[in-house]
Amino acid sequence: MASRDFLGRFGGEKGASSDKAGGGAGEPDEVVELSLGLSLGGCFGANSGRDAKKPRLVRSSSLAAMCSLPGTSDDIAAATPPPAPLMRTSSLPTETEEERWRRREMQSLKRLQAKRKRLERRTSMNSGKSGGSSSRDDAQEPLYPSAFQLRRSVVDQGNASSSMPEQGSGDGAEAKSTSSMEISSDNNNQNKSLPPPAPSTAGKLPNGIVKEQPPLRTLRSLTMRTTSTGDLRKSMMEDMPIVSSKVDGPNSKKIDGFLYKYRKGEEVRIVCVCHGNFLTPAEFVKHAGGGDVTNPLRHIVVNPSPSVFL
């Protein structure tokens, strides 16, 4: 059976069928379609009358509501409901052109009102500042002198004190010291009598704390300071000169010191540089290794040159 011809098998069936057809009265000849032309309802255009009685494949749909069931066309039309209309979706809410224009107009009006309020607030603040500053200046002008006038008066006093002639070593030093003390006391009294100036708006911080402005330092003030320190050192040298011991002997040594300032009727004191002790002239000579001498001032020498310790 396996060795039989496949086409012969179909041919035998064809002959048998032809015999049956010949034996039948009005049956048409059945032709087997051997081609591969496939379709849903069979081969298109072949045996349409006979194939109409056979059940055909039903075309399916992607929508569940539109699926058709096997049956006649009238039954399908009656059982199938009409498809629902599809709704068009969008990401933004539907609104008319009038609503959109109305919303834009409201936004523009709000912006204009906010801008107008800011301008009014700024103008009011500027006018208040200008009025307050002008009234403050008018009130303070007749009461307090300006900083330039104070600086000029101090400079004039310093020039007048420096232009005074020197009358002598001791008298000149005393005059300079007294004049400098008077100038400093006058300046202190002026500074104490003057109230602190009103702080400017530029030195204020956002939290209301007033920041103090540092005083201005000019070249003239610096030169005056250096000259005053030089005069002070010179006056100290004149009041307390440097002395040294002049002793001859095997155990003698040179000791430096300075003559401490003393008044009339007081005993002369010499400060020893090596130990810092206050000694009398006899003790100073004895400290240098001279022993007990009758006239100790002869063994003490005054050095006119400034010392390295000052």
UniProtKB/Swiss-Prot annotation:
It comes from the Eukaryota. It is found in: Nucleus. Residues 156-166, 176-193 have a biased composition (Polar residues). Residues 1-29, 68-140, 156-215 are annotated as: Disordered. GO terms for biological process: negative regulation of DNA-templated transcription; signal transduction. Keywords: Nucleus. The keyword Lyase does not apply. Residues 99-108 have a biased composition (Basic and acidic residues). InterPro entries: Ninja_fam, Ninja_motif, NLS_NINJA_AFP-like, TDBD. GO terms for cellular component: nucleus. Belongs to the Ninja family. This is Ninja-family protein 3. It comes from Triticum aestivum.
